Amino acid sequence: MAQNITLQFVEEKDLENLENVKLLFTEYSNSLNIDLCFQDFNNELKTLPGKYKKPSGSLILAFVDENLAGCVALKKLEGKICELKRLYVRNQFRGLKIGKILLEEIIEEAKKFGYTHMRLDTLPSMKSAQGLYEKFGFYDIEPYTYNPIEGARYMELKL
């Protein structure tokens, strides 16, 4: 039976979905087995939507048959450059192309905001995510932000 995948943009006053974002961001962080304190992660959770607030940022949730399945975020870096953050799909929903759907939507959102480039950093252990980024045309760049994890990969997409 086909599953119904829906996306929802999270607005500043949408308290229920901001809680869903916190839940998924926390699951994402726990899945990495590293401390994201170098990204001021705890403050990020406390101040949501924070740097992901429109008109320069965005938060998107994915649902499968109304079950919370995944998320992605976008924030302004500088000028016309944005950063992709927190692309995450829960284990039980992997294989349904939700990561691809979220990535397509956040790229379109970045274009609407007038960004010309999207950057990201990813960990060496995230091979499937890196493969997805490569399929979308992301290419390797020099480090643009601090990441203490050895082998972190920095990528960019021309929008």
From Swiss-Prot:
Its EC number is 2.3.1.-. One of its GO terms (molecular function) is acyltransferase activity, transferring groups other than amino-acyl groups. CoA binds at L87, Y88, V89, G95, G131, L132, Y133. Keywords: Acyltransferase, Transferase. It comes from the Bacteria. InterPro entries: Acetyltransferase_Enz, Acyl_CoA_acyltransferase, GNAT_dom. The keyword Cell cycle does not apply. PROSITE patterns: GNAT (PS51186). It holds the Pfam family Acetyltransf_1. Residues 5-159 form the N-acetyltransferase domain. It is an enzyme of class 2 (transferase). The keyword Acyltransferase applies. Catalyzes the transfer of an acetyl group from acetyl coenzyme A (AcCoA) to an acceptor substrate and releases both CoA and the acetylated product. It prefers L-threonine, L-serine and L-methionine. It can also use O-acetyl-L-serine, L-tryptophan, L-isoleucine, L-valine, L-homoserine, 7-aminocephalosporanic acid, thiamine pyrophosphate and thiamine. PANTHER family: FAMILY N-ACETYLTRANSFERASE, PUTATIVE (AFU_ORTHOLOGUE AFUA_2G01380)-RELATED. This is Acetyltransferase CD1211. It comes from Clostridioides difficile (strain 630).
